[in-house]
Amino acid sequence: MSVVVQHVEEKAVHSWSRISTAGKKALEEALLVFNPMSQDLSATEAQLVAFLQGLRDDGFQPTILRSGDVYGYSSCTANPPSQTKLQARAPTPAATSPPASAPQTAVRLPAGRATLLPMPLSGRLAKASTPGLAKHATTNLLLSSLKQSSAGRAQGAAVGFPTHLYPGVYPAMRLSVVLEALVPIKTPVACLGAKPKAQSLQLSLGDSPLKVRKGPGKRLGNAQLKAPRKATSKGSKCLAQRGPRSGPRQGAGLQSKTCKVTGSLGGPRVKDGGALGTKAAQAKAACAQAKVAQTQATATQARAKAKAVRARAKAKAARIKAREVRARAKAKAVQAKAKVARTQPRGRGRPKGSIQGRTARRSRKSRPETVGQKRKRTEEAKDLSPRKRTRLGPRSPKVQLGPGTARLLKFRAIKVDRLASDDEVRQQAQRILRVNLSPVIRLQPLPPHSAP
């Protein structure tokens, strides 16, 4: 895992990732992003290197941010950068901001502190040090203290970088801290060139409150506390010009003049502006209430319209359902009438048992009987006694059932008991099937429990 001087093996991440805690954490996160199911991070790093090499072979040019590009110093050493390197890397003071001073010991960034950096540092400083002041005033004090510390290090009493406000910041990252503090400032660079003196304002890094001297200069602090939250360009210039002035009388005179010109600090103008602001706020609140009432009325109308549409749809569905019920009832009545018409006989007042005679008469008309068939039917009628004839008569299913079910009579079973003879069974089968059966019939005995 050590760095090879001859560059025989290329590493995806340089040696700073193996020296500092934050670097190790960043390397592990990068490897886990490349292969989330990895069990061996060394093998995953080799896979990452091979993947990048394959991209180079295919013609792509992957850009790898080195730690020197990010933090401003070489990654092959754990020593913090010297003051000359920082001054060489930092831009000129007239362009953006002065270079920051580096302490003797390097501060390591823990893994959990990395999430604090995207938040604006000037806002955090304003909340931690002076909550009553506006943000632009705190930012001006921060930049003034940084410029004083960089320009006057020979005095010995210069204020250093506020490390207690940024506990996890690298030495080389303080340049980015200064650039981040420059964002909310709207004043030109010329207003920041003067050095603030300790007579008007003092910034103590131990307690981090803003101390103001007693006397007439106290009105200067009150004016800063009473300043409106929304800072205009004129208000920012007023605060920036008033800071470097020495002496309480000059600050008070400047305050009275600027109050007459701008009308944004102290005095009766503040009351007038407050009244106007209150009226504007009341008018805005009234407009908002009117909008809310209009929105509620529109919503009520929409709900009423939707309710009416639902009621009409429900009534229409009920009418359609009633129509369908009537149609079904009518169809059912028609079917019942047709069924009754099918089951009733078509004869003119003949009894129910006349179907057999009518069928026999029709067959007699279509085909004349022979002499042998007449004699056979007469003999069968003589053989039967009157008692048996009456007993076997109602048993004929042809007489009891209508013409619709006459086709199913060949599947009808003939029940035989002890009193029935073979001739009776044969005659009953002949009546049902209307065929001349042979006199040989195979009979099976009934079960003992069904016998009478």
From Swiss-Prot:
<feature type="region of interest" description="Disordered">
    <location>
        <begin position="209"/>
        <end position="256"/>
    </location>
</feature>
<keyword id="KW-0597">Phosphoprotein</keyword>
<feature type="compositionally biased region" description="Low complexity">
    <location>
        <begin position="87"/>
        <end position="106"/>
    </location>
</feature>
<feature type="region of interest" description="Disordered">
    <location>
        <begin position="81"/>
        <end position="106"/>
    </location>
</feature>
<dbReference type="Pfam" id="PF15374">
    <property type="entry name" value="CCDC71L"/>
</dbReference>
<keyword id="KW-0175">Coiled coil</keyword>
<feature type="modified residue" description="Phosphoserine">
    <location>
        <position position="129"/>
    </location>
</feature>
<feature type="compositionally biased region" description="Basic and acidic residues">
    <location>
        <begin position="377"/>
        <end position="386"/>
    </location>
</feature>
<dbReference type="InterPro" id="IPR026695">
    <property type="entry name" value="Ccdc71/71L"/>
</dbReference>
<feature type="compositionally biased region" description="Low complexity">
    <location>
        <begin position="332"/>
        <end position="344"/>
    </location>
</feature>
<feature type="region of interest" description="Disordered">
    <location>
        <begin position="322"/>
        <end position="404"/>
    </location>
</feature>
<feature type="coiled-coil region">
    <location>
        <begin position="279"/>
        <end position="344"/>
    </location>
</feature>
<protein>
    <recommendedName>
        <fullName>Coiled-coil domain-containing protein 71</fullName>
    </recommendedName>
</protein>
